[in-house]
Amino acid sequence: MQTERSLQSFSNRYTQIPFVYDVKRSVYNEENFQQEHRKKGPTSGNVDIDITTFKHHVQCGCSWHKFLRCMLTVFPFLEWICLYRFKDWLLGDLLAGLSVGLVQVPQGLILSLLTRQLIPPLNVTYAAFCSSVIYVIFGSCHQMSIGPFFLVSALMINVLKDRPFNNGHLILGTFVKDDFSVPTFYLSYNRSLSMVASTTFLTGIIQLSMGMLGMGFMATYLPEAATSAYLAAVALHIILAQMTCILGIMVSFHAGPISFIYNIINYCIALPKANSTSILLFITSVVALRINKCIRITFNRYPIEFPMELLLILGFSLLTSKITMATENSKMLMNMIPYSFVFPENPEFGILSRVVLQALSLSFVSSFLLISLGKKIANFHNYRTNSNQDLIAIGLCNLLSSFFKCCVFTGSLSRTTIQDKSGGRQQFASLVGAGVMLLLMVKMESFFHNLPNAVLAGIILSNVVPYLEAIYNLPSLWRQDQYECIIWMVTFSSAILLGLDVGLLISLAFTFFVITIRSHRTKILVLGQIPNTNIYRNVNDYREVILIPGVKIFQCCSSITFVNVYHLKQKVLKEVNMVKLPLKEEEIYTLFHESETSIAENKLCRCFCDCEELEPEIRVVYTERYENRQEQDSSINLIRCSYLGSGDSSQVTSEEQIPYTVSSTSQRNIVQSYEDTEKAWLPNSPPRNSPLPPPEASESLAQSRSRSIIMPYSDTSVQNNTHTIILDFSMVHYVDNRALVILRQMCNAFYNANILVLISGCHTSVVKSFEKNDFFDEGITKAQLFLSLHDAVLFALSRKFSEPSDLSMDETETVIQETYSESDKNGNLSNLRLKTGKAIIEGSQHASPGFTKNLKPGKDDLEFDLELDPMLSFEQSSGMDLNLDLDLDLDQSELDPGSELDSEIQAKPELELESELETDAQTEPETEEEPELEPEPEPEPETEPEPEPERERKTRTRSQSPWRNYFTAYRFGSSNSQSRAPPQTRPEKRKPHNYPNSP
């Protein structure tokens, strides 16, 4: 009660206090972050030096700490023997060792009865003692009891059928004593022992090799459900095998597929011959052990069960030595064994090739049984086991037992449970049990010959029944995880019906299949933003989540491989309303066989080929386009998006629109391809000496210009409102080669469709795989990789609001305001208009220092101004209120780069310039009050200078126009970038531009 109160007060104390963090930093992409922060290389300790020589590698790779860790890994007993607590653990280990030793003696005696192989009992004893010592030194489980396990040894029946030493009567359950008088009996018996020894030797070699090669990781792929199901199936096999001792009858023993059903049928047939005394002794033992569970002994705060197994074995052994009972015991079986001890010999290596399959199945079954049992015990006591070390330990145990002509050893399910519940805490209990077993078998073997087999069967069944409790937990497991429940049922049914070896293989294969399905059936979530936070969640989970206009965020919840990358592709295309359409035949023909007449008619589709270099390959075979595209210009869109998408012209166009993502490769070719781009994409503008069109013509000219040039986020563009796609790779730790190819194709397809793809939260290993596989190109650069999802969203919003859009400034403030915290609203929103006007300039400075230097903005700026002047004058005369609030505190020189580049204005004195500007300001309102815009007279030839007042009035009008900043920033970047740049980066003085086709 006091603990609950303290927890409640703790929770109340910290839930009432809101924790707020406020972080101000730059938006980082992967390229900028790597430039500002140096990666840590291989160093020696805390010294920041590069390890370049072999001596440095040896010095840094070898240390006293690493040596100790290696020794503790190879010899785990050094860890617990140095920390052993004698006062707390000694009594429990002694009692557990005595109980296990006394149980192991009769189990060794009746081993021949269950495995149907007459193995000398002293050979089993010596091999079990040596194996226990080896596992204490090399094993990692503290409560494991190593020794013979009859279910594993029973798998050798298929081997013994090839060389039966008593005509197979022992396997069939009929003991004919006359067989032992045959002269060839001893020869056949020695051959069968050699077969067992060779199989055990090869099993040990396989297990030792698996441990050396680190194959223990395979056990980690088996979930807890598969381990629980396999142990439950083993427990059920044990119960069925003990029916021989419980009923006191002998039946023919089967091993292999469907053997479980065959054995049940045989027991049902022999049930009328059951021994009632054996059944009564079995019930007595089970009741006594059940009562013992209610008796608890505590020693130094550690619970210890009363050693009832020790009392039952000693009591019934003493009772049967005084009173004759009509029940089955091991005395008859011991009399049938011709030798009590066989000296160690080398296995017969000539028959190893004949037992490879049997050795493989035995090695897998014994290894998995040991590892799964050790993991279950270790989880109960809150420590970890080393699967590779256990494989090495059990391999050494089987190698040693093969020289004693003994069967395969593994962890015993019943003895391990007895050692655990009797109070054993460390492997010292296993040493005590092995010593007790050796002492009793050497000195008092005959004392246990009269122990009833039913009593031993009751002890074994009482300790393995708890493993069947997993069957009762199936409904709850189904509610928790259906995949785990299916794995449990498949493992259990296959191990029961097909045997432990085949069932294990089926369980492994099915578990791998389920894990593969679950890992590759990845979830692609569409994320939205929690308002006023940098938290992004699934749009279907929370009501408060809002979608960011124009930005689609997709989160990949697992690794991306060749299996699920197509699912990701279809999901993204579906959410963005795009479909994959093959090129039509006429479009392909137009693309590659366009005639010169068609080029002359439509100069917007003119493609220039450099014959000195090879034509770049078409990167996107199938063009990603919108289903509701305009039919009249589909060929133009195909040429732009599919053919010129990998060329220089489209490359420069996209870089003008997205200055943040300028790659290093494109910077080298941007100056060379600028003239070609100008010819290929600029519309047919009127010459300078032609009269300006009226307002209606200006509007149609602007519309045709917007249709001819791919203007982002416009209604006439062949795309919807989505301008940025963000892929959240924070949960992705691996991308294979095929997935990289598909991702690159996706990025190029969206790049050609004028949609920017950003990737956020990439792990370092994923970035390295991108770099190794040449993932980055024109469609996706390293500058498009952001450290966090919020960085990518901020970049997408700044890119959106720095260009003309359909949103008003109020809507822009509302959208951007949601990305700031409450504490930043007052400070940041006041400068929102200033920041939106300079976003591209700042982005170009971050993306590439030479971006403003490489662009050539001064070549056709005056021409663009002449086209824009009629529209601006018409808007001013009609009283249109744009309400863009772009009256910034900037100089006129910063707003109008054209005035700076005019040599005649710059040559005038300042006083004369100011007086002329004041005169123009007084005459300007008269111009604005005119109801209609009259056509201006035809300008004079370029050689004659224009009158100064008229030119200054045009310059002033352009500087005061709000759209001037937008279109200048969109096409060439704002003039602030030129004013801030060093003197050598300022563009040259602009000259009049003559079109080649002007009249």
Swiss-Prot record:
Biased composition (Acidic residues): 893-903, 912-947
Reaction catalysed by this enzyme: sulfate(out) + chloride(in) = sulfate(in) + chloride(out); oxalate(in) + chloride(out) = oxalate(out) + chloride(in)
Glycan-modified residues: 190
GO CC annotations, alphabetized: plasma membrane; sperm annulus
Family matches, as PROSITE patterns: STAS
Membrane association type: Multi-pass membrane protein
Subunit structure: Interacts with RACGAP1. Interacts with CFTR; stimulates anion transport activity of CFTR.
Free-text function comment from the UniProt entry: Antiporter that mediates the exchange of sulfate and oxalate against chloride ions across a membrane. Stimulates anion transport activity of CFTR. May cooperate with CFTR in the regulation of chloride and bicarbonate ions fluxes required for activation of the ADCY10/PKA pathway during sperm motility and sperm capacitation. May play a role in sperm tail differentiation and motility and hence male fertility.
UniProt name for this protein: Testis anion transporter 1
Annotated source species: Mus musculus
